[in-house]
Amino acid sequence: MVKTAMLGAVALVIALGGTCGVADALPLGQTDDPMIVAHRAGTRDFPENTVLAITNAVAAGVDGMWLTVQVSSDGVPVLYRPSDLATLTDGAGPVNSKTVQQLQQLNAGWNFTTPGVEGHPYRQRATPIPTLEQAIGATPPDMTLFLDLKQTPPQPLVSAVAQVLTRTGAAGRSIVYSTNADITAAASRQEGLQVAESRDVTRQRLFNMALNHHCDPQPDPGKWAGFELHRDVTVTEEFTLGSGISAVNAELWDEASVDCFRSQSGMKVMGFAVKTVDDYRLAHKIGLDAVLVDSPLAAQQWRH
């Protein structure tokens, strides 16, 4: 997804562009290493959002688990990301058109492929869609969980997730996140949930810091916030006779932006789409609390 910023000070954004190529020269610094969080339980290594992926990510030594949640037609939270079951499974249709029993008969690894390997290795090895409760049970009891809610309308999903977290005793270690503002708002109203900052607010603050050095909107104490370490954006400058457009690979997280988010006690920040040891060292250098990775198997080497 590409965001468009309406700006006059184009040069400031362009100065942020480019892919990091400094990591071999970056020291690891004196602070603690950033948490390594398995994105969709490790979407590159194993079929995403499955118990198989979760257990292997735990074995790889991740510090946190990022799981994508929707709700079945009979109100049970399950792990699945796309809007159509056909994208990843041997089924079809939206998640909330099926009961949990029907969903668990599908193979979540049906379309999974391994880079550089032909074929679909899990078509003969079923990997069911797990319930959120099953997924929680597959994680260590002290592991932080990030639950990315991916379904509208929001309230059935939010209420069902809250019930599972209460029943399993996992609410205290779970952070609810969504790119959808309505879901974030509904989760914030739900008693007992810890909710990450709205992506819209996070993005606005990062651009304000990059373009006019203002830490605004004010950080929200105690919340998590996340954004990509590198993000492709389109910058549009308006003129009387038209407009000028520049494509930028922006690095919006830097030491100043991290300090901005931390200006209110307790706020924690995560870099999304961290793919290489260079990215990890950059995240360490600027002080991010956590990084979101697709391959826990690769990431386990970054701390050595």
From Swiss-Prot:
<feature type="domain" description="GP-PDE">
    <location>
        <begin position="34"/>
        <end position="303"/>
    </location>
</feature>
<dbReference type="InterPro" id="IPR017946">
    <property type="entry name" value="PLC-like_Pdiesterase_TIM-brl"/>
</dbReference>
<keyword id="KW-0732">Signal</keyword>
<dbReference type="InterPro" id="IPR030395">
    <property type="entry name" value="GP_PDE_dom"/>
</dbReference>
<dbReference type="GO" id="GO:0008081">
    <property type="term" value="F:phosphoric diester hydrolase activity"/>
</dbReference>
<dbReference type="Pfam" id="PF03009">
    <property type="entry name" value="GDPD"/>
</dbReference>
<protein>
    <recommendedName>
        <fullName>Uncharacterized protein MT2337</fullName>
    </recommendedName>
</protein>
<feature type="signal peptide">
    <location>
        <begin position="1"/>
        <end position="25"/>
    </location>
</feature>
<dbReference type="GO" id="GO:0006629">
    <property type="term" value="P:lipid metabolic process"/>
</dbReference>
